[in-house]
């Protein structure tokens, strides 16, 4: 009796820790993979060259697939116009975007940076992502497929649209409550949220989330929205610094995806054309409408959000004017603006813009 009562626990405890971690990660990645399928059968058949007629990622019959968000059935309407026209980026400006990091200088910065690292850990876990050290990109465990990149993009963009909406909403209510102007912050924050949503809609034209991905997004968005809402009430400066650090991670993610594409690790994307929604939104010119061009545009947007939020984090939240929504006295000098011509990785300091 005694030997039997102790044998079971000993055998369970003898399972190596690394095996348990591998099992959890493998299960998470397989479930997340099952939660994402390509939503355009003709495009997938063309670009993924599946002679058997099966899609690259899916368990759903092709006959059941339809446009994930088809245009509304309104015969009298040609197109829905947006209030925020996207600025035109040049290819030179987009290629000049680099990975960067703003050093934490005070307790507020450290709280923001620590929170981003925690969020990054959770996102890496659910999307199966491992960031390689320099020179380790060719190691198999660090390699990402097109399917895995899309899964990460969809999850990332579904969460990235939350901060701008929360910040804009709270500042809008504050302006109404105090009966004072907001000095241009609301428009920029709402435009940021809209831009992140357009990223998501673009990637959803390429892959349709399944039930598991929807569940992950629902949980992450619910927790993140409420957490960010409360945090913004306590310290808006910390929240903007948090978003600045989060966008640093986004720039890093898209930079690595671009490098993988350029090095031939993502062959199915080499000749893939950007969805029509992306062509119209970014005003992509003829001859520059490939998947690589799309990633360059998205990365440039993330770099702009990085600059904007690091800059807003440097300002006095209650009194300073938003420098990205003003007309400058001397336009010949470099100033913050909607474009990326004078992009600053770590944001503009308060002395430079006030």
Swiss-Prot record:
Known cofactor(s): Fe cation
A GO CC term assigned to this protein in UniProt: mitochondrial inner membrane
Bound cofactor: record note: Binds 2 iron ions per subunit.
Enzyme Commission number: 1.-.-.-
Transit peptide, residue positions per record: 1-64
Subcellular location as annotated: Mitochondrion inner membrane
Keyword Transmembrane: yes
Residues that, per the record, bind Fe cation 2: 196, 247, 302, 305
Matches recorded under InterPro entries: AOX, AOX_sf
Function: Catalyzes cyanide-resistant oxygen consumption. May increase respiration when the cytochrome respiratory pathway is restricted, or in response to low temperatures.
Protein name: Alternative oxidase, mitochondrial
Species, as recorded: Emericella nidulans (strain FGSC A4 / ATCC 38163 / CBS 112.46 / NRRL 194 / M139) (Aspergillus nidulans)
């Amino acid at each position: 009796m005694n030997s039997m009562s102790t044998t079971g626990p000993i055998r369970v405890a003898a399972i190596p820790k690394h095996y348990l971690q591998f099992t959890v990660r493998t299960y998470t990645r397989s479930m997340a993979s099952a939660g994402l399928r390509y939503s355009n059968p003709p495009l997938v058949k063309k670009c993924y060259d599946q002679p058997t007629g099966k899609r690259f990622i899916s368990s759903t019959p092709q006959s059941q697939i339809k446009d994930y968000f088809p245009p509304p059935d309104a015969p009298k309407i040609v197109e829905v116009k947006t209030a925020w026209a996207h600025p035109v980026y040049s290819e030179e400006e987009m290629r000049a975007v680099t990975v960067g990091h703003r050093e934490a200088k005070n307790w507020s910065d450290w709280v923001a940076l620590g929170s981003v690292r925690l969020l990054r850990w959770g996102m890496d876990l659910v999307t199966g992502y491992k960031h390689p050290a320099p020179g380790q990109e060719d190691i198999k465990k660090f390699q990402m497929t097109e399917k895995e990149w899309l899964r990460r993009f969809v999850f990332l963009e579904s969460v990235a649209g939350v901060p701008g909406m929360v910040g804009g909403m709270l500042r809008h209510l504050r302006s109404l409550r105090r009966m004072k102007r907001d000095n241009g912050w609301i428009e920029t924050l709402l435009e940021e949220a809209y831009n992140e949503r357009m990223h998501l809609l673009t990637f959803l034209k390429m892959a349709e989330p399944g039930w598991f991905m929807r569940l992950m997004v629902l949980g992450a968005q619910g927790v993140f929205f409420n957490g960010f809402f409360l945090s913004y009430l306590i310290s808006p400066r910390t929240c903007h610094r948090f978003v600045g650090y989060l966008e640093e991670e986004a720039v890093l993610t898209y930079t690595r995806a671009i490098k993988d594409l350029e090095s031939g690790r993502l062959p199915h994307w080499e000749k893939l054309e950007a969805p029509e929604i992306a062509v119209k939104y970014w005003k992509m010119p003829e001859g520059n409408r490939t998947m690589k061009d799309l990633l360059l545009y998205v990365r440039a947007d993330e770099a702009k959000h990085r600059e904007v939020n690091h800059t807003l984090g440097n300002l006095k939240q209650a009194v300073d004017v938003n420098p990205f929504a003003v007309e400058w006295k001397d336009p010949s000098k470099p100033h913050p603006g909607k474009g990326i011509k004078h992009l600053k990785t770590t944001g503009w300091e308060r002395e430079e813009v006030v």
